[in-house]
């Protein structure tokens, strides 16, 4: 821009836009895709609400399924409630 006021020539570029390929062509080795992660879980007991701490090690897809189960109807109970409510 030359001067205090911009003119249309300053704002419009005379160059043609170029097309950029934004696809990622990186190859990820299979061992990285299926690597296992330690995952800490803190949740209340399904019967007495005492906090439980679990650690799982699995691949990401299995951990995602576990999360869906825990957010659904699956309830984990503490050892004391497991003994108290054990069916004989």
Swiss-Prot record:
Q: Which GO terms describe its biological process?
A: DNA-templated transcription; symbiont-mediated perturbation of host cell cycle G1/S transition checkpoint; symbiont-mediated suppression of host innate immune response; symbiont-mediated suppression of host type I interferon-mediated signaling pathway
Residue numbers of motif LXCXE motif?
A: 22-26
In the UniProt record, does the keyword Magnesium occur?
no
| Region ranges (E7 terminal domain) | 1-37
Quaternary assembly: Homodimer. Homooligomer. Interacts with host RB1; this interaction induces dissociation of RB1-E2F1 complex thereby disrupting RB1 activity. Interacts with host EP300; this interaction represses EP300 transcriptional activity. Interacts with protein E2; this interaction inhibits E7 oncogenic activity. Interacts with host TMEM173/STING; this interaction impairs the ability of TMEM173/STING to sense cytosolic DNA and promote the production of type I interferon (IFN-alpha and IFN-beta).
PTM (free text) = Highly phosphorylated.
Top-level taxon of origin: Viruses
Q: What is its main location?
A: host cell
Keyword hit for Transferase: no
Zn finger spans (unnamed): 45-81
Domain commentary: The E7 terminal domain is an intrinsically disordered domain, whose flexibility and conformational transitions confer target adaptability to the oncoprotein. It allows adaptation to a variety of protein targets and exposes the PEST degradation sequence that regulates its turnover in the cell.
Q: What does this protein do?
A: Plays a role in viral genome replication by driving entry of quiescent cells into the cell cycle. Stimulation of progression from G1 to S phase allows the virus to efficiently use the cellular DNA replicating machinery to achieve viral genome replication. E7 protein has both transforming and trans-activating activities. Induces the disassembly of the E2F1 transcription factor from RB1, with subsequent transcriptional activation of E2F1-regulated S-phase genes. Interferes with host histone deacetylation mediated by HDAC1 and HDAC2, leading to transcription activation.
**InterPro entries, A to Z:** Papilloma_E7
Organism of this sequence: Human papillomavirus type 63
Q: Where in the cell does this protein reside?
A: Host cytoplasm; Host nucleus
Protein encoded by which gene: E7
Q: In chain numbering, where does the motif Nuclear export signal fall?
A: 63-71
Name of the protein this chain belongs to: Protein E7
């Amino acid at each position: 821009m030359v001067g205090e006021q911009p003119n249309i020539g300053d704002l419009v570029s005379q160059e043609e836009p170029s097309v950029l390929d934004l696809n990622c062509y990186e190859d990820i080795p299979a061992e990285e895709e299926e690597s296992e992660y330690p995952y800490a879980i803190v949740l209340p007991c399904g019967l007495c609400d005492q906090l439980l701490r679990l650690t799982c090690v699995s691949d990401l897809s299995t951990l995602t399924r576990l999360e869906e189960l825990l957010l659904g109807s699956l309830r984990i109970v503490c050892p004391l409630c497991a003994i108290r409510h054990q069916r004989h």
